[in-house]
Amino acid sequence: MSASTISSFRSAIVPVLLLGLVAGCDKQVSGNRQAEATPTASAPVAAAPKADKIDRTHKGDPAPSVSFEGPDGKPMTLARFKGKPVLVNLWATWCGPCVKEMPTLDAAAADITVAAISQDKDRPTIDAYFAKNGFQRLKPYLDKNVALSVTYEASLPMSILFDSTGHEVWRSTGGMDWTSAEAKALLAEAK
């Protein structure tokens, strides 16, 4: 296959994957697709994870070397977390299930490192969201090029648990209550 054919294929596949990313989020938000979703007091808490929602088929795969922005706005990769287990959560401010699970991710971050990596397009959007919601433990990571979502062919929210050596333990798609007993047991699988 020639280099131009490969380049054409990549140019065609990226928009399709991005469309799948947006379509995969059951955003439950009306109005502007890019409008920030907000959790409400009457909104149900994300469901506890179910064993059948946990995908272990990639167990042992190394973390990708895809670059994204750290909380300081500087480029980084998942390798920065090597040496400790980390729960990577791909989310966006316009994704209803993502927004619902953020408070429980913040609570879970008391026991495990959580990298909530926004798939939004700009830092001011997520900085404003974090300031408005007053998270105690989560930090605003940003993947404005959605490179991780493309790598994982992700529907939002997607969570991937990595062990301390940087290898995948499991992944899950859909919102969860990260404070549930089942979620705590799943997170304890990373060493």
PLM regions and their residue ranges:
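N-terminal targeting signals for export/organelle localization
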Residues: 1-65, 181-184, 191
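A short beta-strand-turn-helix
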Residues: 55-61, 65-86
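Conserved redox-active cysteine motifs that mediate thiol-disulfide chemistry
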Residues: 82, 86, 90-107
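Alpha/beta-hydrolase fold active-site loops
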Residues: 85-86, 111, 167
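Hydrophobic beta-strand anchors of alpha/beta hydrolase catalytic cores
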Residues: 87-88, 114, 159
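Structural microenvironment flanking redox-active thiols in thiol-disulfide oxidoreductases
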Residues: 99-133, 144-150
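Thiol/disulfide oxidoreductase modules built on the thioredoxin-like
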Residues: 131-137, 142-190
